[in-house]
Curated annotation (Swiss-Prot):
Entry keyword ATP-binding: no
GO cellular component labels: cytoplasm; nucleoid
Cellular compartments annotated: Cytoplasm, Nucleoid
Domain of life: Bacteria
Native species: Gluconobacter oxydans (strain 621H) (Gluconobacter suboxydans)
Keywords: Cytoplasm, DNA-binding, Repeat, Transcription, Transcription regulation
The protein's name: Transcriptional regulator MraZ
Compositionally biased intervals (Low complexity): 142-164
Length: 164
């Protein structure tokens, strides 16, 4: 399975298009089925960014909806939050897309954007906000990693009590 890796910065052109990084395009194309759009974009519920999904990964988000009565308010709210602001997009031959204005506004995008790989998905950020998010994520990841370490495993670099 192709993954979305790294952080890449691109600029909008005069027509408002931005190029999806080549490695991200390759990952999207490798997972697309005939007739599928290249990517599905939607606003993040957690951050001021845009989420990028393959059709398959996006479809997996709908699985929990099957647990709800399709005529219930809960189902309708979840479906609206998932689908109403989702945009299936294809790129031109150069790999450029035009981001819908409401997504650009949600992510506070102006001239430049950062594409941030998250493994099976990616995000599109304002570059300054992306840098802050990456720093916060690294800090939190350190905390999570140390809090989940088994008691019997010494911390990296900690050789206290190790046999000599």
């Amino acid at each position: 399975m192709s993954m979305f890796l790294g952080t890449h910065q691109n600029r909008f052109d005069a027509k408002g298009r931005v190029s999806i990084p080549a490695s991200f395009r390759a990952a999207l194309k490798s997972q697309a089925q005939p007739g599928d759009p290249l990517v599905i974009l939607r606003p993040s519920h957690l951050h001021p960014c845009i989420e990028g999904w393959t059709v398959g990964a996006f479809a997996s988000l709908a699985t929990p909806l099957d647990e709800y009565d399709p005529f219930s308010e809960d189902h309708e709210d979840l479906a609206a939050s998932l689908y109403a602001d989702a945009y299936p997009l294809d790129s031109d031959k150069e790999g450029r897309i035009i981001l819908p204005e409401n997504l650009r506004t949600h992510a506070a995008l102006t001239d430049e954007v950062s594409f941030m790989g998250l493994g099976r998905t990616f995000q599109i950020w304002n570059p300054e906000a992306a840098a802050e998010r990456r720093q916060a994520a690294r800090s939190r990841a350190r905390t999570l990693a140390t809090s989940r370490r088994p008691a019997s495993a010494p911390a990296a670099g900690n050789t206290a009590g190790a046999a000599e």
